[in-house]
Amino acid sequence: MAFQGTSRTLTQQSSAASSDDLQKILFSPDAIKKMATECDLGRHHWMRADNAISVRPLVPQVTSNNLLSFFKSGYDAGELRSKGYMSVPQVLCAVTRTVSTDAEGSLKIYLADLGDKELSPIDGQCVTLHNHELPALISFQPTYDCPMELVANRHRCFAVVVERHGYIGYGGTTASVCSNWQAQFSSKNNNYTHAAAGKTLVLPYNRLAEHSKPSAVARLLKSQLNNVSSSRYLLPNVALNQNASGHESEILNESPPIAIGSPSASRNNSFRSQVVNGL
């Protein structure tokens, strides 16, 4: 995957003349080449026995120098509000194994700040993957913006750290790590808030029900149910009750049907309920 990006976050806070300088810093052929060779952006990095620990900064050294000079000059001249921040919304790492599942080993992958001498994981964002768990897709999200500054003669920026453990007897490549991200630079930093994990319930949706017509039996049952709910029953010598409560009580108190041909059938024939609205 080739490096792609825009300079909107920079050009919105700088003049037109400065925009050309920014595009040269970020998107010149040399800058794009450095992003690939020094940072392995969109490239497969092989984890070997002779390369057990890999620290890949998200910004090349030359690009960091140019950005640091650009923001510092703008800040000293009063044109920019700060000396520059680096933000990375997300770092996506695709990890695949290149040995059989029987190999005993693991990879430890995390996001670090080069300003930290110990290279500790940022807010505990660290993943340990055993060989039999690969392949896997990992996502890291920094929780703050990294200032563009020098710390002990080191350019401060985010970095992806991969450590290989185990794999006794395997001197070659045991896993491949392909990382992708899009770094953004601005004179104004962002505010980050903690969000609790949530769950969204997704109900199944029957799309065929919209295009299929109900059967004749289903239509008949539906019409009968509608008529029963709106019908009024009239008993002999009983006035018609227009209230809903009276209607419900009459339905509940209705006598069970009498079998045709029984001795009481003719005697009770005149006492059958008469349906006003009809079924």
UniProtKB/Swiss-Prot annotation:
Residues 267-279 have a biased composition (Polar residues). GO terms for biological process: transport of virus in host, cell to cell. It comes from the Viruses. One of its GO terms (cellular component) is host cell plasmodesma. Keywords: Host cell junction, Transport, Viral movement protein. It is found in: Host cell junction, Host plasmodesma. Its main location: host cell. The keyword Phosphoprotein does not apply. Residues 256-266 have a biased composition (Low complexity). Residues 256-279 are annotated as: Disordered. InterPro entries: MPV. Pfam families: 3A. Belongs to the cucumovirus movement protein family. Transports viral genome to neighboring plant cells directly through plasmosdesmata, without any budding. The movement protein allows efficient cell to cell propagation, by bypassing the host cell wall barrier. Acts by forming a tubular structure at the host plasmodesmata, enlarging it enough to allow free passage of virion capsids. This is Movement protein. It comes from Cucumber mosaic virus (strain S). The lineage of its organism: Viruses, Riboviria, Orthornavirae, Kitrinoviricota, Alsuviricetes.
